[in-house]
Regions:
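Conserved phosphate/anionic-ligand binding catalytic regions in large, soluble enzymes, centered on
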Residues: 15-33
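Contiguous domain-boundary segments centered on the initiation and propagation of an alpha-helix
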Residues: 73-123
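Non-transmembrane, aqueous-exposed alpha-helical and coiled segments at domain scale
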Residues: 39-48, 108
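Generic secondary-structure signature for well-ordered alpha-helical cores
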Residues: 19, 35-42, 73-77, 91-95, ...
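A structural-propensity feature for long, helix-poor, extended segments
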Residues: 48, 52-91
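Short glycine/threonine-rich loop-to-helix capping motif typified by GTGT followed
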Residues: 58-66, 108, 194-201
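A conserved regulatory-domain signal marking ACT and ACT-like small-molecule sensing domains
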Residues: 84, 98-101, 125-227
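Short, Lys/Arg-enriched N-terminal segments with co-localized hydrophobic residues
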Residues: 1-7
């Protein structure tokens, strides 16, 4: 009957996303989009997405492409609207393109997302789906980093001069925020450095704003995915 047919159609739509061996990487792709949008700290107006490795060979049409866009729209991996993400993106005026790329020394399930926001913010994120719906952020704006975004994470771009690490760590200590990991990356050519700090507690919003106005701090990004 009609009802049975409707059910079949729904199953056809949801099938590739919910079942099968690719589902953990589909979940990973949604999370890559979701975290990238949080890192942009703005609604995505334009996305240029490059797929590498097995994402490039199976990504288009296997749901990876739709999953990435769904994440950029703020969806979670269990959202039933994922298969319709392209249409939903068009409705909110998000432009997006997909192409393939070959990266050196990158994980096989890797995507590079070049994003522009509604308020002029821009970011380039290179991230990998590492299985089980987990992801690894490998590069931010061309600088190699290494974090999962599973804990509250504070990312500080600053001019590479003494004192900035101490400013940030002492501020966190004052606010009783415990540092779980601190990684420091330096871009010799650009003369700036990036701190990636994972914390055990949330970082208060006013602390983030205080950091932003410090001399020599270029950009502060804070994500707490419990949001």
């Amino acid at each position: 009957g009609v009802r049975n047919e409707a059910f079949m159609n729904l199953f056809d739509i949801l099938g590739p996303v919910m079942v099968g061996p690719s589902s953990s990487h589909t979940a990973g792709a949604v999370r890559i989009g979701y975290i990238s949008e949080k890192l942009l700290q703005d609604h995505v107006r334009k996305a240029e997405i490059l797929l590498h490795g097995s994402f490039a060979t199976t990504g288009i049409g296997h749901g990876t492409d739709k999953a990435l866009i769904a994440g950029l729209l703020g969806m979670h991996p269990d959202d039933i609207r994922i298969p319709a993400s392209f249409d939903l993106a068009k409705k909110v005026g998000m432009e997006f393109t997909f192409s393939t790329v070959t990266l050196k020394d990158a994980h096989p399930n890797t995507a590079v997302l070049r994003l522009s926001g509604e308020h002029g913010r821009k970011i380039e994120v290179q991230a990998a789906s590492i299985g089980g719906g987990r992801i690894l952020i490998a590069k931010l704006d061309g600088i190699e980093v290494n974090f999962t975004a599973e804990k509250p994470t504070l990312i500080v771009h600053n001019v590479d001069q003494p004192g900035h690490v101490a400013q940030v760590t002492s501020m966190l200590a004052e606010r009783n925020v415990n540092i779980a990991t601190l990684q420091l990356y330096r871009d010799k050519r650009g003369g700036y450095a990036v701190m990636v700090i994972e914390t055990d507690q949330e970082v208060p919003q006013d602390s983030v704003e205080w950091l932003e106005q410090l001399n020599g701090i270029i950009k502060v990004t804070y994500i707490n995915v419990e949001d």
